[in-house]
């Protein structure tokens, strides 16, 4: 039944959530058999029905390749699915506590409509134990069915990396787990139809959940170390980029870089792990310290910008600063939890006028989410300083002459990701600071 050539027609898969994680699942399974993409956002559904990815990660040609894909905002379609994959956001609230409301809401909707014998697979990032402690009871309550008798549950943490065309759903090993050995094999075979390198089987759902949160916690902590080193080197008067390049010549030096840590994964997932630890009476110190450092980098960069402007002789109050980039990372349109906003707000607290250019993201979304009006490159003023906040490819392609047209002579250039030629900028009379 799992054979891609013999039995695909017997399957109907449904994916709940048509974001960065869910839509690629619909597309890949939709190339082989009926795959239903469900989302409560009618706008997302309408965009997908027209053959356009709302997040602009997938090209229209890729969308069209999924000849068996369907899209709906009617939850009744979930009753037709043999497999239901859950790919909804799992954010944190303002106090950095896990917000499971999207996941609970999705589980309620699924429970009300799923058929007997269905396998529900969660992909959303959660703390170890959340699927069995929070989601399964909701499925039982809403459906009136019994777990492991009438329906089964698996877990396979998403590994989608927005803006990354190298590491995709189909070429990255998928971690899988199931509530029974039979479910595990069923889930493994299901994903093996689309994931070329295959799957890694975990012995429990909890182990698979833990796997995901530590992947991002490890990265968060490594970046936090680089950020702390950058702060120290700045005080010493050293260029962090040069020091890291030198250290990188050793075979076992891990090549992480300092920078802003935002988005819906790296800056969020550690809080899910620390929440679980707190529930068990253990209060993590290293993980929280890393989060504190990374969350403070926007303020630090803004402060350095002001110091560099003063060193240039600029009068700070009423000064103009151009910020290049607003998304949480390079080469993607995702504005969620962007730490560039920390820089912008801190600069504005000095009565600095901030202008933002972001070529990848939606201007309407930036205005709605943050109250920020995005400007085309041509409309940016000649400012007292430029903050190159996000390393988009389009910014890397800019010539020194392009940059100097948008900054006063003798102004300050703040290169957060060290992506531009500092020597050439200095030769053009620009003061350069980089993280």
Regions of interest found by a model, annotated:
Residues 2-435:
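Structural/interface elements that position substrates and couple domains in central-metabolism enzymes
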């Amino acid at each position: 039944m799992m054979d891609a050539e013999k039995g695909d027609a017997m399957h109907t898969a449904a994916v709940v959530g048509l974001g960065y994680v869910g839509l690629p699942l619909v597309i890949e399974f939709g190339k082989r058999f009926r795959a239903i993409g469900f989302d409560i956002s009618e706008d997302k559904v309408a965009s997908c029905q027209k053959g356009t990815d709302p997040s602009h990660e997938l090209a229209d040609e890729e969308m069209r390749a999924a000849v068996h894909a369907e899209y709906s905002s009617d939850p009744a379609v979930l009753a037709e699915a043999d497999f239901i994959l859950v790919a909804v956001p799992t954010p944190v609230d303002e106090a950095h506590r896990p917000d499971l409301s999207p996941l609970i809401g999705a589980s309620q909707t699924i429970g009300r409509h799923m058929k007997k014998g269905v396998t529900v697979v969660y992909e959303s990032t959660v703390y170890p134990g959340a699927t069995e402690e929070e989601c399964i009871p909701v499925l039982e309550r809403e459906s009136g069915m019994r777990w492991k008798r009438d329906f089964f549950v698996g877990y396979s943490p998403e590994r989608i990396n927005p803006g990354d065309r190298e590491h995709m759903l189909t070429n990255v090993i998928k971690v899988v787990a199931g509530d029974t050995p039979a479910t595990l094999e069923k889930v493994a075979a299901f994903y093996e139809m689309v994931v070329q390198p295959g799957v890694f089987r975990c012995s429990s759902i909890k182990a698979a959940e833990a796997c995901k949160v530590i992947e991002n916690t490890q990265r968060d902590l490594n970046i936090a170390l680089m950020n702390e080193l950058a702060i120290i080197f700045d005080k010493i008067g050293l260029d962090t980029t040069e020091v890291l390049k030198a250290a990188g010549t050793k075979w076992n030096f891990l090549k992480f870089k300092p920078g802003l840590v935002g988005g819906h994964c790296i800056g969020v997932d550690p809080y899910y792990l620390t929440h679980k630890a707190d529930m068990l009476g253990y209060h993590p110190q290293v993980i929280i310290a890393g989060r504190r450092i990374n969350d403070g980098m926007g303020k630090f960069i803004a402060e350095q910008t002001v110091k560099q402007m003063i060193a240039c002789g600029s009068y700070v109050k009423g000064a103009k600063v151009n910020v290049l980039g607003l998304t949480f990372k390079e080469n993607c349109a995702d504005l969620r939890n962007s730490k560039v906003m920390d820089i912008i707000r801190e600069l504005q607290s000095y009565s600095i006028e901030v202008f933002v250019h972001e070529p990848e993201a939606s201007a309407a979304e930036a205005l709605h989410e943050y109250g920020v009006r995005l400007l085309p490159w041509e409309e940016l003023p000649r400012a007292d300083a430029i903050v190159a906040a996000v390393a988009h490819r389009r910014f890397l392609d800019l010539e020194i002459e392009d940059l100097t047209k948008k900054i006063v002579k003798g102004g300050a250039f703040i290169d957060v990701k060290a992506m531009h030629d500092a020597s050439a900028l200095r030769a053009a009379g620009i003061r350069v600071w980089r993280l």
